[in-house]
């Protein structure tokens, strides 16, 4: 099919469709770290000399039409920088351009200190407290030009200036933390999320959400993988990488109150084969049983070197790409399970399944490419707790008769 990008950029109350270039990125490039603030760069054309009414700190939303002509939101944030330039003089006057730099809501966490004590509780509850403090704005923090008349009719005072999406309840019990006058919200939230095997990230509309440890397992069991045909990928973007830097065969965890307890584990066979690759961690996990499970999982995943796909790039303007796949790529989101098939047979066995960790896009009026960074599936699967899943959609049938609940990660149907 023939498809060319049609953009709709909304800044505050203003809508722009004369877009000449777009780029954005959101997510993380390292599964050992939490996502960082996304960004977008947009250039729009002004041919009539009218005044630009774009202000810094105003919300910005990028939408892209899919194959059926429906606009799909692909990025949300707020304006950080705005620049007006001249493209070329015309007989009727100058043609000017507006260049917008937008940043994601996670950037707000770097600017806010969380100076309140955190009680012992599930990771989701602690994350909710930190995000609520940083991302629920007061009226004094709202862009000065904004009035109540600009809000949709269904918006209430309680949620008018909230940048919080969905926060899972949590999977692990975390230690309590004393109040600190210097605790950065981002550092604190990242430490809790990483300790609990969760992910903090930006939704496509700009809100910040938190997925706890079994979120991806449950989503995969309910929805399965989205299939993407690797034969439509840019060939030079496809590569498998195996690194010694990813090996971990000796682990030391400092956990519990004030990180005063220590748990260690190692794999002698891996050490004999590859040498010692030791890592130590400060974990906010409270209980020994939990830290034991986390350490065992990490050791099993990392004790042997393994190939990984990493990033893969697709041209959305490829006339041969099927409409369904085009729409899947436009709608792709952080944490989505995908299966890349039709890869070379001598590269990862010809297919790779995993979860989307980062999305980056570059576009001109005639060119669009999207690059996905994908982590292997088993790095995101965890031991499922029955109380955190939906019994109506997950049933204990169709599995091997010898399978126990303890080992049922990813096996439910």
Model-derived features: positions:
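Acidic, small/polar-enriched beta strand-loop surface segments
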Residues: 1-16, 119-121, 125, 187-353, ...
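Short amphipathic alpha-helical segments
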Residues: 38-40, 173, 310
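Terminal peptide-recognition signature
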Residues: 42, 192, 356
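Glycine-centered loop/turn motifs
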Residues: 55-59, 181-182, 333-341
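Charged- and aromatic-enriched interaction segments used to assemble
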Residues: 68-71, 88-242
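Short beta-strand-centered aromatic/proline hotspots
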Residues: 74-84, 351-362
